[in-house]
């Protein structure tokens, strides 16, 4: 007998070797957890906690249970590998959880793949475990791996259009593995690795600068990826090197993927506030790519809440991600096992169930389940897809900011695998970078790192061109000013005194009578007769004469102003002819003569009846002229009054005496001219001019008058003078509407004007109580007379308001133009009607053409194109002739014959229109019809012609001759089938004609036939028998009229309408 010890061992081995036995009560599975010596108890507790969770959810229970076997590994002698073998051979486990350490995971996963046992790697981070050809049953549930965080980093960079980057790392195996994984992910996104800078781990920050590593990075990249192993914290060293090399500015982007290559490494950060403080101190102003929960306490708090419900054991927070991954791994295994057992179609004969590792792996592909915090997705390689985030370490803020979310989603776009996962980057914050724009800088300078992308030749050429252009502009300005000065010095507006012929009173009356129109309105008496002159040969002008006491020297401003006045051209501006000065002690201002005098003459002429049309037209002309002056280089009028508005022979108002008021006063102040006049009427109205001047201008004028000659003349801005024009325009509107000034009738206007001229404050213009006026115009006038210049409306607003209130659409001439326009519109309407009639006639002609010729032939001929002859392989041609038509014609008048044929052929046309046939022509009583031409219709042409002939025969049975009701027409019909040629014959009078043997035979069939019968050829008979047997045919015999031997013809006698019913009845029988 065996000793007791060996007997016990043998029994234990035999018991453990027995596979899972399926009973009606429960299936028990075994899992082997290979932990480390330090945390074996903790890992076992987490598995028990997960088992309890699955039991509560009903996954485990009466029918399924999982037995947890924990062994220690991760020792110096690969104890975990031996333990894995023992678990398989002795314990007969159904799945592995672990090993906890990476060095033992690879051999255990290889053995599990060979044994077809599922293995859950909850701490696997190395990229080598992504090889599904080697690790066929490995399911990775770890929160992050080299390939996953590398893909997340590449996705973030591609989302921000980063195309080039450099990698800096220390020399070492772990760093090399990280670099390989990261470069692979970058290449897949089209991102170029410009440089890979490697340095010794013992290097200091100063060494990195002195050895040229930092310069190499600066010269090749603006986006830098620091990848360091965890054996020594090099992040601070590299960060100090960036400060020493002046590379800590926002011009450079540091993207730090927090990668853990192996489980033996400590994670670069933990989570929560401690992690934020650590990262901010070591990596300010950088972007960290890390697990979405890496800088938050959410995962820890949620897991602690679950853990505390079971047992209170201290949790090493550094291993939090591994603990959560182990917890979720057990839940995944339980759910997959349940699904796997349900997928078994039948129980094995021996009742023993073995877990198929590869089948379980396939079930995990694309699986989604609820994890501790969110849903967990397995990709096409049965690897957990973790949610990552991009964190911006802003040294100016207390907290690390989440700028982008990098989530995994299932997609079917351009995917051939069973399950495809796509990384989707969504921005949380868009403008976060510490730059003026808040956006990430470009991955490469615009001109390249060595200015290789910029051709400075072009810049130099452009700079030279710009300098040349600037010099040219300055030279042009100088030349323009010189030319302008030369032009001003030439004084185009100067009129020499010898060119001016002063007219006396008799000469003026003679000239005015010749130029004035003979209308009742030409008899207006003028209260103020200006001086008249002839300038040059025949230019009739009026002038203002001033005594000149000293020679006048014009300033540059005076020269520019007078030149602008000479150049002013507008329908409502009176042309300025020029100035005669420094001759005969006289200063003459010459303006073009307007035959109907001034607006003042019309307003205060009692004989002249001024209706609303005149008022509206006058106001409109003044506003148009003022608007032109205000928008022109002159800028203002400066002396607007009712006598400075002239009326030409077409009753169009023209502004005159513009822009000269200020120079005249200045010259008078300096003693160069005398503005006093001798004419009493003119003196009176000269005094009244102050009533058109606003208060602020009157005050300024009085101040200028009181100044000494050596004191500077106080001028006014263009805007102030425009506002002054609006004030005067308000007064003129009132005069036009009411033929009086806007003051009370009891007021002495002469005294009021004297006070205004002396600068005293006088009453404002106002609308008198007995005057009725449009409310809009009342408001407009009150605005025009406002004491505050800035409150006065612009001339554009005045024009629009007066056009609406006075309903003006132009001057008096415009009314006549509108009548002519209405006539033109009526003429246009008449032309349109006639054009419509022509189009209708054209349509009728077109319809007639389509009746004479086939439609497609007519379209081609209308387009000017020729229609080529065409041979038709199969068609049927029919001829008809009325028997005894000649005799009938001899007994009838021509009109009766025409009416007969018109009625008969109209009936024939009706019969033809019901079938696919075309009437070729009619000659007297002969009628020619074809089917299959010009549109081919297979073999249906013979049936169409047959139906037409029978229809004509039926028609004639009831047809009555209009002028002989008792007379019955008899017709001969004949047709033939075969080849026919068709062509258009003639140019000026085209005809559509048919040619060929078939046409000739069809004519013989008609001519050799009998009245009231239809004669057909044997070809037509064969087509009817083969294709349309419902038609009734009788043989006639050999027709000797046809020049062919033994030519047999037939009679078409009718159509059996019940043919197909009889045929169907025969078949049914």
Curated annotation (Swiss-Prot):
Chain positions recorded as Mg(2+) 2 binding sites: 881-882, 925
Give one Pfam hit by family name. Answer: ANF_receptor
Q: Where is the signal peptide?
A: 1-23
Q: Keywords of this protein's UniProt record, alphabetized?
A: ATP-binding, Cell membrane, cGMP biosynthesis, Glycoprotein, GTP-binding, Lyase, Magnesium, Membrane, Metal-binding, Nucleotide-binding, Receptor, Signal, Transmembrane, Transmembrane helix
Q: Report membrane topology.
A: Single-pass type I membrane protein
Chain ranges passing through the membrane: 459-479
Which EC number(s) are documented for this chain?
4.6.1.2
Please give the catalytic activity noted in the UniProt record: GTP = 3',5'-cyclic GMP + diphosphate
* Protein kinase domain mapped to chain residues: 497-806
Q: Which parts of the chain does the record assign to the membrane side Extracellular? A: 24-458
PANTHER family cross-referenced by the UniProt entry:
GUANYLYL CYCLASE, RECEPTOR-TYPE GUANYLATE CYCLASE GCY-29
Put simply, this protein is called Receptor-type guanylate cyclase gcy-29
Query: What would be the name of the gene that encodes this protein?
Result: gcy-29
């Amino acid at each position: 007998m065996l000793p007791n010890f060996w007997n016990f061992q043998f029994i234990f081995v035999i018991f453990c070797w027995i596979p899972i036995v399926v009973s009606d009560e429960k299936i028990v599975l075994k899992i082997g957890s290979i932990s480390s010596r330090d945390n074996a108890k903790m890992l076992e507790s987490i598995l028990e906690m997960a088992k309890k969770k699955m039991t509560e959810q009903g996954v485990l229970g009466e029918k399924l249970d999982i037995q947890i076997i924990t062994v220690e590994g991760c020792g110096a002698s690969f104890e975990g590998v031996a333990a894995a073998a023992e678990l398989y051979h002795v314990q007969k486990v159904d799945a592995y959880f672990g090993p906890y350490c990476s060095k033992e995971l690879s051999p255990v996963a290889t053995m599990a793949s060979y044994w077809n046992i599922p293995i859950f790697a909850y701490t696997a981070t190395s990229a080598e475990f992504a090889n599904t050809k080697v690790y066929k049953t490995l399911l990775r549930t770890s929160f992050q791996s080299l390939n996953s965080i590398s893909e997340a980093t590449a996705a973030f960079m591609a989302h921000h259009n980063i195309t080039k980057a450099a990698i800096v790392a220390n020399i070492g195996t772990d760093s090399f593995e990280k670099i390989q994984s990261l470069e692979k992910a970058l290449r897949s996104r089209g991102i170029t690795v410009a440089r890979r800078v490697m340095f010794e781990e013992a290097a200091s920050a100063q060494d990195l600068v002195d050895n040229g590593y930092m310069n190499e990075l600066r010269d090749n990249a603006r986006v830098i990826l620091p990848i360091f192993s965890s054996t020594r914290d090099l992040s601070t060293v590299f960060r100090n090197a960036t400060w020493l090399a002046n590379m800590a500015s926002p011009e450079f982007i540091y993207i730090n993927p927090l990668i853990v290559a192996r489980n033996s490494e400590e994670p670069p950060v933990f989570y929560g506030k401690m992690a934020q403080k650590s990262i901010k101190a070591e990596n300010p102003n950088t972007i960290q790519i890390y697990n979405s929960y890496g800088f938050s306490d959410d995962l820890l708090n949620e897991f602690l809440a679950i853990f505390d419900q079971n047992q209170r054991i201290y949790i090493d927070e550094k291993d939090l991600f591994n603990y959560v991954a182990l917890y979720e791994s057990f839940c995944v295994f339980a759910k997959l096992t349940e699904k796997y057992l349900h997928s078994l179609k039948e129980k094995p004969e021996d009742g023993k169930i073995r877990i198929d590792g590869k089948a379980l792996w396939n079930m995990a592909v694309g699986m989604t389940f609820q994890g501790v915090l969110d849903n967990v997705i397995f990709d096409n390689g049965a690897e957990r897809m973790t949610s990552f985030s991009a964190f911006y370490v802003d040294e100016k803020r207390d907290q690390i900011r989440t700028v982008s979310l990098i989530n995994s989603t299932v997609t079917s776009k351009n995917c051939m695998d069973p399950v495809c996962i796509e990384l989707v980057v969504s921005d949380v914050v868009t403008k976060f970078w510490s730059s003026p724009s808040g956006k990430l800088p470009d991955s490469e300078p615009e001109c390249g790192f060595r200015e290789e992308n910029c051709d400075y030749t072009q810049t130099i050429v452009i700079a030279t061109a710009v300098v040349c252009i600037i010099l040219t502009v300055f030279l042009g300005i100088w030349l323009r000013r010189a030319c302008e000065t030369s032009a001003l010095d030439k004084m185009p507006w100067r009129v020499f005194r010898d060119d001016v012929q002063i007219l006396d009173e008799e000469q003026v009356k003679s000239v005015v009578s010749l130029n004035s129109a003979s209308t009742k309105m030409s008899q207006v008496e003028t209260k103020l007769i200006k001086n008249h002159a002839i300038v040059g040969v025949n230019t009739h002008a009026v002038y203002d004469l001033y005594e000149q006491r000293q020679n006048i020297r014009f300033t540059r401003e005076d020269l520019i102003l007078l030149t602008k006045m000479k150049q002013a051209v507008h329908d409502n501006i009176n042309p300025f002819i020029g100035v005669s000065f420094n001759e005969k002690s006289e200063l003459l201002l010459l303006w073009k003569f307007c035959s109907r005098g001034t607006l003042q003459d019309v307003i205060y002429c009692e004989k002249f009846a001024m209706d609303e049309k005149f008022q509206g037209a006058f106001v409109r002309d003044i506003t148009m002229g003022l608007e032109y002056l205000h928008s022109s280089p002159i800028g203002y009028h400066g002396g607007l009054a009712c006598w400075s508005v002239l009326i030409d022979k077409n009753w169009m108002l023209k502004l005159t005496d513009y822009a000269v008021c200020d120079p005249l006063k200045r010259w008078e102040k300096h003693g160069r001219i005398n503005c006093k006049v001798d004419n009493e009427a003119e003196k009176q109205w000269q005094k009244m001019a102050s009533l058109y001047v606003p208060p602020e201008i009157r005050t300024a004028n009085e101040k200028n008058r009181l100044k000494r000659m050596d004191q500077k003349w106080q001028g006014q801005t263009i805007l102030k003078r425009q506002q002054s024009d609006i004030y005067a325009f308000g007064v003129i509107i009132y005069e036009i509407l009411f033929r009086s000034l806007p003051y009370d009738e009891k007021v002495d206007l002469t005294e009021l004007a004297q006070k205004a001229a002396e600068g005293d404050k006088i009453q404002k213009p106002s609308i008198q109580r007995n005057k009725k006026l449009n409310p809009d115009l009342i408001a407009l006038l009150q605005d025009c007379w406002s004491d505050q210049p800035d409150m006065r409306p612009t001339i554009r607003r005045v024009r629009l308001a007066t056009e609406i209130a006075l309903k003006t659409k132009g001057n008096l001439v415009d009314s006549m133009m509108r009548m002519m326009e209405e006539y033109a519109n009526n003429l246009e309407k008449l032309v349109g009607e006639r054009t419509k009639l022509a189009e209708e006639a054209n349509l009728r002609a077109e319809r007639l053409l389509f009746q004479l010729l086939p439609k497609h032939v007519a379209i081609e001929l209308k387009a000017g194109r020729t229609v080529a002859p065409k041979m038709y392989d199969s068609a049927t041609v029919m001829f008809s002739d009325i028997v005894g038509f000649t005799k009938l014609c001899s007994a009838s008048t021509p009109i009766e014959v025409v009416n007969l044929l018109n009625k008969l052929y109209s009936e024939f046309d009706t019969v033809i229109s019901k079938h696919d046939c075309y009437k070729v022509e009619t000659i007297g009583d002969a009628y020619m019809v074809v089917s299959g031409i010009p549109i081919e219709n297979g073999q249906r042409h013979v049936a169409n012609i047959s139906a037409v002939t029978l229809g004509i025969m039926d028609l004639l049975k009831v047809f009555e001759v209009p002028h002989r009701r008792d007379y019955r027409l008899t017709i001969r019909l004949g047709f033939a089938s075969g080849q026919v040629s068709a062509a258009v014959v003639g140019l000026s009078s085209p005809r559509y004609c048919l040619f060929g043997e078939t046409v000739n035979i069809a004519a013989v069939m008609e001519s050799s036939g009998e009245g009231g019968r239809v004669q057909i050829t044997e070809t037509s008979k064969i087509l009817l028998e083969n294709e349309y047997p419902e038609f009734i045919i009788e043989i006639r015999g050999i027709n000797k009229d046809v020049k062919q031997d033994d030519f047999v013809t037939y009679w078409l006698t009718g159509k059996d309408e019940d043919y197909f019913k009889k045929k169907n009845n025969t078949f049914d029988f």
